[in-house]
Regions:
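Surface loop/turn motifs at the tips and blade-to-blade linkers of beta-strand repeat domains
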Residues: 77-80, 147-153, 193-198, 251-255, ...
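Hydrophobic core register within WD40 beta-propeller blades
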Residues: 86, 159, 206, 259-262, ...
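Asp-box/WD-like beta-propeller blade repeats and closely related beta-sheet repeat scaffolds
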Residues: 142-165, 170-209, 221-224
Length: 433
């Protein structure tokens, strides 16, 4: 047994005791959801935060997630390597970014345990660093054609096609490539548009503007609450706006700890995003959230959360706290809400206009949250009701194992909802029953 595994087991035992002690402190708080959530008071967990994460099992033959009433689900593509994000091309081809978080050098005993836990959950390991193309040639909802579209990338995540240029969000920046309609691959050399600092929250989501003149990129923080100081966080925890004509870039909005999925609300033209909030303050404190994004807006990280609730663990800046914007809609504590796409009314039978959200699932609370795909209804450009499940059943009944973990969500050319599952290594396809 290696020293790292010994250390991990020691911390796991201590963490298990701490987890049981926290459970004895009282009933679990109610989920913090919606436009006016009840966010429990912070209970800082110090050097040993709650650590609970199911082991990755994957799906058995014939097994699949549970679709909401009126819906059905099938596997569109299988046998991938940690599929994270989805891009659908105009001809219906489906591109899948296959990548993973890469382990850094552990700095503390807790980091040893955290890395061991994440490996067990398949959330840490080798990164395939490729984009794979799938094509459903006969229209039966299952891809028959599989091609390596791009390889040798650097933890690719976000993708976007604007005209004849294909953009990839590598962890260290956005790269542009020439694209030919219907091509099975891109082998040309790319052109880097902007560089980002890698590590930490490593995903780089992309979303073009409706007119194709701008490209938006999500760049998460390096750390949980800027433990290494704000200098190393410069240029992070933000959404960038790239001008595709001039090549210039700027921070469009900041204070967003880890903004991942982005989508346009088509009736208002407003940008929305889902954000993963900080750890170590309790099961529901603070909640992850869905929010509209204002040009020049600041959303609190690291100084405060859910508006202007100060995080006492962080050296404060009163001026920044004073201008922090309260998010629009809470998505529950530590649900790891990553995927986001607009779903027009009628796309899924019985579902009105709204947003589909892929919730990757928690690792740092006493009871698990997330591990599902949910839907938030919209009316007049804003969230208008409680969430509804689209897909569930990603966890074993005892919650010790996960069959899958949803990440990216998007609409296929046939109106189906496609869901990337990076534990099951599947792309799921949701349609009316």
């Amino acid at each position: 047994m290696t020293m790292s595994s010994i250390m991990a087991r020691i911390v796991a035992v201590i963490g298990g005791v701490a987890l049981q002690w926290r459970k004895l402190q009282g009933a679990a708080p109610a989920p913090a959801w919606g436009g006016a959530p009840v966010v429990p008071a912070a209970k800082p967990q110090g050097a040993l935060p709650t650590l609970k994460m199911p082991s990755a099992r994957g799906w058995s033959e014939g097994q699949k997630p549970v679709a909401a009433p009126g819906l059905k689900v099938n596997a569109f593509a299988t046998d991938l390597k940690h599929p994270r994000w989805i891009q659908v091309l105009p001809n219906g081809d489906v591109l899948i970014a296959e990548s993973n978080q890469i382990a850094g050098k552990p700095r503390t005993v807790f980091h040893y345990a955290m890395q061991a836990t994440m490996r067990r959950a398949r959330a840490l390991g080798e990164s395939a660093n490729r984009i794979t193309l799938f094509r459903d040639r006969d229209g039966d909802g299952v891809a028959e054609v599989r091609e390596t579209f791009m390889e040798g990338l650097n933890q690719p995540f976000g993708m976007a096609l604007v005209g004849d240029t294909f953009y990839v969000g590598n962890t260290d920046g956005v790269v542009a490539f020439p694209y030919v309609a219907g091509a099975n691959s891109i082998t040309a050399q790319g052109r880097k548009l902007v560089s980002f600092k890698p590590s930490g929250h490593w995903t780089r989501s992309l979303l073009p503007s409706a007119d194709g003149k701008k490209l938006y990129a999500g760049v998460g923080s390096l750390s949980n609450i800027a433990e290494g100081g704000m200098a190393v966080e410069e240029g992070r925890a933000a959404i960038y706006e790239l001008d595709l004509t001039s090549g210039s870039s700027r921070i469009f909005a900041g204070g967003l700890r880890n903004a991942v999925g982005m989508a346009w609300e088509p009736n208002t033209g407003v940008l929305w995003t889902v954000v993963n909030e900080r750890d170590g303050l309790g099961d529901e404190t603070p909640p992850d959230y869905l929010t509209s994004v204002r040009d020049g807006g600041f959303y609190g990280w690291p100084y405060c959360y859910w508006g202007q609730t100060v995080d006492d663990r962080v050296p404060q800046d009163a001026a920044m706290v004073a201008k922090a914007i309260t998010p629009d809609y809470a998505l529950g504590g530590h649900t790891a809400s990553l995927g986001l796409c607009w779903v027009p009314s009628g796309t899924l039978p019985g579902f009105p206009d709204g947003m589909a959200i892929g919730q990757h699932g928690s690792w740092n609370r006493s009871t698990l949250s997330g591990y599902k795909v949910v839907f938030v209804p919209f009316t007049n450009g804003r969230p208008s009701g409680p969430p509804r499940d689209i897909l569930s059943g990603f966890l074993a009944p005892d919650e010790r194992e996960s069959y899958g973990r949803p990440v990216g969500v998007t609409l296929g050319s046939d109106g189906s909802l496609l869901v990337a599952d990076d534990v099951g290594d599947v792309i799921w396809r949701v349609t009316g029953a």
